[in-house]
């Protein structure tokens, strides 16, 4: 079919794929992070689960949601989910996880362009232990860098309790200097 032919283009069309990857990867990565870490992980946490249990469960669901895969590819995706979830807790937001996911996808899909087109990335169902180890090392480096930057910038990882209480107690006839 014409649709499947699009995915079989040769590396001579690399620039077309590169543009498509640059335009779509950030949206796709952000959507996955919002779903798995922003929604699913927070739902688990709000049900009383320990936040680290929520990280593990959301990482498991994230890895399983990526379809058929061998043990090493599953471990690769599960580890990425663990690190992205840890970034949410350690940095106080989804931004670092989204950035890490975007970088991962840009490298993975960008590399696949030079190996034969998008069909290489779309059809990935297995990887060897060495490739998984290489990926996990890269994930860890990105996660540590993001965490270090958030610490260096003194990013608040949670809302101060007094601000939360002020917002909860705020009424329409409160003073104009209310922080909410």
State each model region's role.
Residues 2-10, 170-175:
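Conserved small/polar residues in nucleotide/adenosyl-binding loops
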Residues 5-12, 119-121, 125:
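Membrane-interfacial helix-loop-helix connectors in multipass membrane proteins
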Residues 17-166:
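Transmembrane helix-loop-helix hairpins at the membrane interface
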């Amino acid at each position: 079919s014409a649709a499947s032919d699009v995915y079989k283009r040769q590396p001579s069309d690399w620039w077309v794929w590169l543009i498509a990857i640059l335009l779509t990867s950030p949206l796709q990565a952000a959507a996955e992070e919002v779903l798995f870490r922003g929604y699913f992980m927070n739902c688990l946490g709000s049900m009383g689960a320990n936040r680290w249990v929520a990280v593990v469960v959301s990482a498991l669901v994230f890895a399983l949601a990526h379809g058929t895969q061998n043990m090493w590819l599953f471990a690769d995706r599960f580890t990425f989910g663990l690190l992205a979830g840890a970034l949410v807790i350690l940095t106080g937001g989804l931004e670092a996880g989204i950035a890490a996911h975007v970088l991962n996808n840009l490298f993975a899909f960008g590399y696949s362009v030079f190996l034969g087109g998008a069909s290489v990335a779309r059809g990935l169902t297995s990887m060897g232990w060495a490739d998984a180890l290489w990926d996990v090392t890269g994930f860890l480096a990105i996660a540590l860098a993001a965490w270090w930057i958030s610490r260096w910038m003194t990013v608040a990882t949670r809302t101060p309790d007094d601000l939360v209480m002020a917002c909860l107690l705020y009424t329409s006839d409160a003073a104009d200097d209310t922080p909410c």
